[in-house]
């Protein structure tokens, strides 16, 4: 029934708004996080969800192993997983089956950067400045599931960890999202 569906949607929206408000001020549970493992686990979960729905885009991982893997980061492992999962899930949601989502990792100058690139619908240029804002939805995403809070949550999580987020997109071509986090220094590791 339509009323029940709308009530459930509003309940999820309120829950997400509470999460966002809590994230702004809550203390983080800091630990040494293997960000490559986090990315792998999130990509695998999104891939399995796509397969369960009858197919999704190909998800390819390019995480360095030699001469050394990505450094660990210091942070809340559950929150970092949520941020990475959300970006990969968005890329999958807005990319047709048969399309591609590539997840790449690199490390440079004390920063680990995770890039998620897709061949999805892209974000209109006019909508790019607001994508990290609460309740923001690109004009071409209307009618697709989502509350418009996911990227606001991602941005808040990454900023709370001392990092930054960035997006580039071309409508009808695809989107690239970068999550950059400081590596865990020797004083940060247990």
Label the predicted regions.
Residues 91-92:
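Short helix-loop "hinge" at the ATP-lid/N-box region of the Bergerat-fold HATPase_c
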Residues 98-110:
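Short beta-strand/loop element within the Bergerat-fold HATPase_c
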């Amino acid at each position: 029934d339509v009323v029940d569906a709308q009530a459930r949607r509003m309940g999820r929206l309120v829950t997400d708004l509470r999460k966002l408000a809590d994230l702004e001020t809550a203390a983080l549970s800091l630990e040494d996080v293997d960000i490559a493992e986090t990315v792998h686990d999130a990509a695998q979960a999104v891939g399995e969800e796509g397969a369960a729905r009858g197919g999704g885009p190909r998800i390819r991982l390019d995480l360095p192993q030699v001469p050394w893997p990505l450094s660990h980061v210091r942070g809340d492992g559950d929150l970092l997983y949520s941020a990475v999962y959300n970006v990969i899930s968005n890329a999958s949601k807005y990319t047709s089956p048969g399309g591609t989502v590539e997840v790449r990792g690199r490390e440079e100058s004390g920063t680990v950067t995770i890039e998620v690139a897709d061949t999805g619908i892209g974000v209109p240029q006019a909508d790019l400045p607001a994508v990290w804002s609460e309740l923001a939805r690109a004009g071409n995403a209307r009618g697709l599931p989502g509350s418009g809070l996911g990227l606001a949550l991602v941005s808040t999580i990454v900023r709370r960890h001392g990092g930054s987020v960035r997006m580039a997109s071309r409508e009808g071509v695809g989107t690239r999202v970068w999550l950059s986090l400081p590596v865990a220094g020797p004083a940060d590791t247990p």
